[in-house]
Structure formats: C-alpha cells, structure tokens
Amino acid sequence: MFKQIDENYLRKEHFHHYMTLTRCSYSLVINLDITKLHAILKEKKLKVYPVQIYLLARAVQKIPEFRMDQVNDELGYWEILHPSYTILNKETKTFSSIWTPFDENFAQFYKSCVADIETFSKSSNLFPKPHMPENMFNISSLPWIDFTSFNLNVSTDEAYLLPIFTIGKFKVEEGKIILPVAIQVHHAVCDGYHAGQYVEYLRWLIEHCDEWLNDSLHIT
C-alpha cells in the first residue's frame, strides 16, 4: 500500500530543492565483511545470491526514506518494497530482471527466490516474470567485477526516487571476505544520514546472521 505524506513532512523544503533547483542522485560503495555469513551459508549449503537479495530487501523495509516514491504526483512511501533483481542466462549471456515478493521470514523468501531463479534462468527476455508490481526496487549483480566506485546515469522525464543496488565481486583481504555493494539514492528523499542508517542496519543483519538464518532449518 502507498501512503501519502502530508504537509507536515519535515523535509519538505529539502525535497523541493533537490527536485527542482538541484536535481541529483548520489552513489556510494560500501565494503561489507561477510566472513561469518559466508561460513554459515557454506555450512548450510545455501545459495549466496538469494541471501544477498534478502539482506538488501530487509534493510530497505527498515528505512522509510528508502521506500519513498511519487505516485500520481503525490509524495509518499510504500509500506513494503519487493526486490527486482538480475539473473544471467548462462547459454546466451543475456540477463533478465525478475522479482520475488518480499517476506521477512528468511526461509519462505529463500525458497520463493530460488524457485523464481530456476524458473526463469533460461529466458532471453528482459522481464520474463509477469505482473511486476509498482512497489519494487532494483538490484543488479556484477560478480565479475571488484569495483570501488559505481554510478548509474538514470535519464527519465521524472525523477527516479527509489534506491538502486549493485552487488560486486567479493574479495579476500587479510583473511576477511569483503563484498562491495553500490547504493544509489535520490537526494530529494534520502540524505546521507538516512543512507548511514541503512548501512548500519545492513551490517547489523550480517553480523547477526546466525539468528535469522536459523529459519533455514525449515527449508526443504
């Protein structure tokens, strides 16, 4: 459900400034220590990519500024955002963008995500899964590139307010497994403080992965 924001919106002046006078988005790359997470996934024999998608999506639900959008020229936020993510056709080397309904229950989301990837993995269409919802955000994966900087130039008649994530190739540094993730947000709805909140919660989820990964005991 989309909830409109009323005139009491505290960032009203900021929103209008970055939507009209200085229209801009900004990007940042964070390095995530996934050493503990990687070990648990290996032990449980879980696929890495669906877990990465779950982490990014769950953190999005936590921060309202990452769910803000404009619908029919009205500013507001989605109560829930579902992840849309890229997958590679290994034969044609083309990618598709599919989506999976978000579920905070890890086991349920994991099963749905794995099933979606398997179903559409051989498609050559850009959007093979029908009925993509309006309340979704984008994730891309570049597992071949260990990047330190990344930027998307989104050119549309209207400002794209929802966040965009790009996952890079993990590397080993001083015995730690480090995963680069690029985050792009629009300054009209998201300040550096809100981006910092998102990153802090994402790192918390990774550090406490053993708690929510216990749900995977019920994956069959």
From Swiss-Prot:
Q: Which GO terms describe its biological process?
A: response to antibiotic
Q: Does the keyword Acyltransferase apply?
A: yes
Catalytic activity entry: chloramphenicol + acetyl-CoA = chloramphenicol 3-acetate + CoA
GO MF terms held by the record: chloramphenicol O-acetyltransferase activity
Short name of any one Pfam family annotated for the protein = CAT
E.C. no: 2.3.1.28
| Induction (record text) | By subinhibitory concentrations of chloramphenicol.
Recite the UniProt keywords alphabetically.
Acyltransferase, Antibiotic resistance, Transferase
Q: Which InterPro entries match?
A: CAT-like_dom_sf, Chloramphenicol_AcTrfase_AS, Cmp_AcTrfase
Question: Which residues are named in the active-site annotation?
Answer: H187
The protein's superkingdom reads Bacteria
**Described function:** This enzyme is an effector of chloramphenicol resistance in bacteria.
Family, as annotated? Belongs to the chloramphenicol acetyltransferase family.
Q: How does it assemble?
A: Homotrimer.
Q: What is this protein called?
A: Chloramphenicol acetyltransferase
What organism does this protein naturally occur in?
Bacillus pumilus (Bacillus mesentericus)
Query: What's the gene?
Result: cat86
